[in-house]
UniProtKB/Swiss-Prot annotation:
Lineage: Bacteria, Thermotogati, Thermotogota, Thermotogae, Kosmotogales
Coiled coil: none
Organism (species): Kosmotoga olearia (strain ATCC BAA-1733 / DSM 21960 / TBF 19.5.1)
Record-level GO BP terms: translation
Listed name of the protein: Large ribosomal subunit protein bL28
Alphabetized UniProt keyword annotations: Ribonucleoprotein, Ribosomal protein
Amino acid sequence: MSKVCEICGKRPTTGNTVSHSNKKNKRWWKPNVQKVKVIVDGEVKKMRVCTKCLKAGKVQRAV
């Protein structure tokens, strides 16, 4: 499943996990993307939307 928000374009990003001894290991931070039914131009469509966009009300959910 693609981890990209179709509204804001948020996608996974990389970085390092840093241990107490300062060793660095690569890791991924993934956005919390949900598959939701959304009303777009009067039609119901399934989209992948991050929870930040859902909370902000950037999409109108279909009931």
